[in-house]
A protein has these predicted regions:
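An alpha-helical interface "stripe"
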Residues: 1-282
């Protein structure tokens, strides 16, 4: 690996930042864990999903496997994930997320987790899980990457969304974030050139949207980000993340330390859109 790449400049710092906002690093996932640690049809983390399902639905513990089967079926429907979304928001007869008490849910992340159906596959840079459900993924590029974020938009809209083999993974994903860790620049405010953008699933085309935190007094850092109660970084977890992705060499580099700042464009948008209270609200 080159010493400075999209992984070292954006991906690794973003993963460490997620630990500051309430996420637990799940560890690196490989295909040999399919069927035991995760379900390859949906990329649901099986032990976490089972544990949380039984915790949130103590009177329906025996229905865990049937619900998992139902989710598998729903995700193959050509409905842009509407069926799964309705299940996700439901509170009766069973619930997958506790929207009233955030503390009853678990939040995990991993990286380079392959979404595979037959011979077709793609691998988001970072995947976020709520109660074991892969509800969000993040794609990162290094600053000033060739083609800017327009290249990422083109890849999603021409390669991933139209591919029916990816439908199940798009249907379960509620939020997609794309960033090259730069401040916004867009042609006429429409075409994504640089910055951090988001979209939701689509059959063929999804517009990349800007996210700007409320900042009525035009402060340098928006109040939500400025006042957020970040957790301290656990150095052992940080070292594990870097080790899992062969990035130990960057640990003491000035560039890596700079990109760990909570107020980089990527880290700001993660706080704004993926902090547990915000993600469940969105």
């Amino acid at each position: 690996m080159k010493q400075f790449s999209e992984a070292t400049r954006v991906q690794m710092p973003a993963m460490v930042h997620l630990t500051r906002i309430g996420y637990t690093y799940f560890g690196k996932l490989s295909e040999d864990k399919n069927g035991t640690v995760y379900d390859g049809d949906t990329n649901i983390l099986l032990p976490i999903f089972e544990q949380q399902f039984k915790r949130l639905n103590p009177e329906h513990e025996g229905e865990y496997l049937q619900v998992l089967k139902d989710i598998r079926k729903e995700l193959n429907d050509d409905d842009l994930g509407r069926g799964f979304y309705n299940r996700l928001k439901a509170v009766s007869p069973v619930k997958l997320i506790d929207f009233d008490n955030i503390g009853n849910n678990t939040f995990h992340f991993t990286a380079e987790f392959t979404c595979k159906n037959g011979q077709d596959e793609f691998r988001p840079d970072i995947t976020l899980f709520v109660n074991g459900l892969p509800l969000c993924f993040v794609e990162v590029k290094k600053p000033n990457n060739h083609g800017g974020m327009l290249a990422e938009s083109t890849r999603m809209n021409k390669e991933r969304f139209p591919n029916k083999k990816f439908r199940r993974f798009i249907n379960i994903t509620q939020l997609m974030i794309f960033s090259n860790n730069m401040e916004y620049d867009a042609l006429g405010g429409i075409v994504p050139i640089q910055g951090a953008f988001y979209c939701t699933g689509a059959r063929s085309y999804a517009q990349f949207n800007c996210f700007r935190e409320e900042n009525s007094s035009n402060q340098k850092i928006a109040p939500y980000n400025r006042d957020y109660r970040y957790e301290d970084v656990d150095k052992v977890v940080e070292e594990q993340i870097l080790s899992d992705y062969n990035c130990q060499v960057i640990h003491t580099s000035p560039e890596y330390q700079t990109n760990l700042d909570v107020n980089t464009p990527t880290n700001r948008v993660l706080t704004s859109m993926c902090s547990p209270e915000r993600l469940l609200y969105i």
